[in-house]
Amino acid sequence: FEYVGDRDTGAEASAAEAVKMGARGSSGREKVYYTRADLEKGVRLESPATGVSALIQAEGLNWLGLWKSFSDPAYALGVEPCNCPGLGRAAARERGLLPMLMPGETRESAVRAQFSSWRTMP
């Protein structure tokens, strides 16, 4: 990752923390990170607790939003490839991170997600 930011604090966070998948009940509240990454190469997320991994790749998108909630019973991960961090339009524009399309201009993007399991689920 080139950059990892915590949505709630606005502070930089470690890549290891952003991709860490905790066990069910390991966190009391959601965590949201926005990362700037080479999504053409992809980002792999792995959950030792469940034996599941995901490889997320994208073309034309340089940011990845990761929403994680490992509370019990809700155990969820949201993955959002995007063209800017989820700071809101005004904050992204102020930081020079909001892409703009000119009239008549087009852009294309593609997203691929590959999921695998390395152990048998009960």
Where are the regions a protein language model picked out?
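Active-site/ligand-binding surface loops and adjacent short beta/alpha elements
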Residues: 1-58
